[in-house]
Amino acid sequence: MTEPGQVPTGKDMADRMAITEIIALHCRGVDRADEATLKSCYWPDATTAYGSDAVPAHEFCGQLAQAIQGYDQTHHMISNSIFAFDHEKAKVESTLIAFHYLKADDGQDTEMTYFGRYLDIFEKRRNIWKLKHREPVMSWSQNAPASHDAYHPALSALRQAARFPDDLVYG
C-alpha cells in the first residue's frame, strides 16, 4: 500500500494504467452488449455480486449482455478510481455513472440514470491484471421521461451507437 499523495513508481503507474484499461473495457462490453469483451475483463475463476450473492463472473457476463439489449442505448462512464495495491492484488473503488435509454411502444420513452461505485478486486497473473471480484454499490438512480432526441439538427448527421458486432468500434 502507498501513502495518499505519494508519487507512484513507474511500475505502480503501469499497473494503474492496465487496471484502468480493464475498467474502461468492461464499460464498452456492457454498452455494446459484447459478452466476449466482458469475459476478457475477468479471470475464469472470478465472481461478481450484482445482487446479494457472488456468482461466477463468466456466467454473469452472458446474462448481462442479454439483459442490456433490453435498452435501446446505454452509456457507462467511470471516474475517480482509487487504488490500493498489495503485491499482486489491488482493491479499486471507481465512481460509476450509467445512462439507460428505453424506447416504449406507446411513445413514452424513459431514461434511467444510475450513480454508484464499483468495488473491485483485481489480481495480476503472468503480468496481466484482470478482475477477481466486482460488486456494484448504488448511490441513487433517477427515472424520467426521455429527453433524448437523436434527430436534433445538430446531431442528425452523427452515426448512432450500436450493439456488438454492428458498432463502428468493431469495423
Language model: regions and residue ranges:
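Short, surface-exposed coil-to-beta transition loops
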Residues: 76-78, 113-118
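Short, cysteine-centered beta-strand-loop-beta hairpins and adjacent loop/turn segments enriched
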Residues: 99-109, 142
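Short, low-complexity N-terminal intrinsically disordered segments enriched in polar/charged residues
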Residues: 1-28, 32, 36, 40, ...
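Acidic/histidine-enriched, glycine/proline-rich intrinsically disordered or flexible terminal extensions
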Residues: 142-171
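Transmembrane beta-barrel outer-membrane domains
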Residues: 17, 71-74, 111-113
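Short beta-strand edge/turn micro-motifs at domain boundaries
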Residues: 91-93, 115-149
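A solvent-exposed, acidic/Ser-Thr-rich amphipathic alpha-helical stretch
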Residues: 35-102
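Short beta-strand segments enriched in hydrophobic/aromatic residues
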Residues: 30, 42, 96-98, 135-138
